[in-house]
Amino acid sequence: MPTPHEAEKQHTGPEEADRPPSMSSHDAAPSGPPSRNPCCLCWCCCCSCSWNQERQRAWQVSRESKLQPLPSCEVCTPPSPEEVQSWAQSFDKLMHSPTGRSVFRAFLRTEYSEENMLFWLACEELKTEADRHVVDEKARLIYEDYVSILSPKEVSLDSRVREGINRKMQEPSPHTFDDAQLQIYTLMHRDSYPRFLTSPTYRSLLLQGAPQSSEA
C-alpha cells in the first residue's frame, strides 16, 4: 500500500505532465518593440518614409506631364510668301499664324522680351482646360512664372490688373488672366510689332519669298 507521500506524487504527476515546457532565456519573446531602422526616427518610420517618397515621385511625374514647357518652335515648315506678306497687314494676322508666332517669338527673344509671348501662349493653353484640378495648377504656375514680382520672367502689368488677378486666384478659372493677356497683347502690338516689321528677321523672310529676276 503506497504511503501518503507516494500517493501525493502520483496525484500531482499527470498535471505536471500536461503543463507546457518552460521557455529558456534564449527562447523568451522580446518584451520591447521591434528593432529600429537606423535611418528612421521610430520603428514604423521606414514604411512611412518609403510611402512618402513614392507619393512625392508620383506627384512630380503628374506635374511634369501636365505642365510641359512650351516648345521653342510651334512649327518648322517655312511660311509661304503670301503668308509672310500678310503679317505686315495686321498684328492679328501675325498672331493667328502659328509660323508667324514662332518667328515673332524668336524676334522677341533678341529683345529680351520673350516672356510676353510665353505668357500669352500660356493663357491660350489655360483656356482649353476643363478639368478643375488642372486649371488650378496651371493658373498657379502662370501666376508664379509671369505675374509674381519675384519671378525673373515677370510681365509688365498695371496695378488694377494685378489686383484683379489676385482676387480671381482665390478661385481660378480658365479666364483668370484674360485682362492681363489683353494688356500684354496690346503691349506687343504697340511696342514690339512695329520694330519686328523693320527688323532683319522679317526683311530676310520677305526677300526669300520675292521673285528672282532673270537675265535675258
Swiss-Prot record:
Residues 207-216 are annotated as: Interaction with GIPC. Residues 90-206 form the RGS domain. It is found in: Membrane. Interacts with GIPC PDZ domain. Interacts with GNAO1. Inhibits signal transduction by increasing the GTPase activity of G protein alpha subunits thereby driving them into their inactive GDP-bound form. Binds to G-alpha subfamily 1 members, predominantly to G(i)-alpha-3. Activity on G(z)-alpha is inhibited by phosphorylation and palmitoylation of the G-protein. InterPro entries: RGS, RGS_sf, RGS_subdom1/3, RGS_subdomain_2. It comes from the Eukaryota. GO terms for cellular component: brush border; clathrin-coated vesicle; cytoplasm; cytosol; dendritic shaft; dendritic spine; glutamatergic synapse; Golgi membrane. The modification Phosphoserine is found at S24, S97, S151. Keywords: Lipoprotein, Membrane, Palmitate, Phosphoprotein, Signal transduction inhibitor. This is Regulator of G-protein signaling 19. The gene is Rgs19. The keyword Transferase does not apply. Fatty acylated. Heavily palmitoylated in the cysteine string motif. It is a lipid-anchor. GO terms for biological process: cellular response to interleukin-7; chemical synaptic transmission; endothelial cell migration; glutamate secretion; negative regulation of proteasomal ubiquitin-dependent protein catabolic process; negative regulation of signal transduction; positive regulation of transforming growth factor beta receptor signaling pathway; presynaptic modulation of chemical synaptic transmission. SUPFAM superfamilies: Regulator of G-protein signaling, RGS. GO terms for molecular function: actin binding; G-protein alpha-subunit binding; GTPase activator activity; identical protein binding; myosin binding. Its main location: membrane. Residues 1-30 are annotated as: Disordered. Residues 1-19 have a biased composition (Basic and acidic residues). Pfam families: RGS.
